[in-house]
Amino acid sequence: MNHFPYTNSDIEPGDFVINPSNRNWGIGQIQSLIGNKVTVNFENKGKLVINTEKIILEKVKN
């Protein structure tokens, strides 16, 4: 899998991401995106709301 930084216009619900600062959270699937708030359901951490002004997620591509 390849990982790369994104802009909010590059992601949408259903996309898969990782938090490079907390890789142990595993891969997360975006549930919703409103402004700079992204709700992500991570496989090892559960559902979290991420502020994309503070944390840059990396989109996962197969």
Q: Which residues does each predicted region cover?
A:
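Residue-level signal for tight coil/turn positions that link beta-strands
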Residues: 34-35, 52
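Mixed-charge, Lys/Arg-rich low-complexity intrinsically disordered regions
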Residues: 1-16, 24
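Glycine-centered tight beta-turn/hairpin loop motif at sheet-sheet or coil-to-beta transitions
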Residues: 23, 43-45
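Short beta-strand-centered aromatic/proline hotspots
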Residues: 26-33
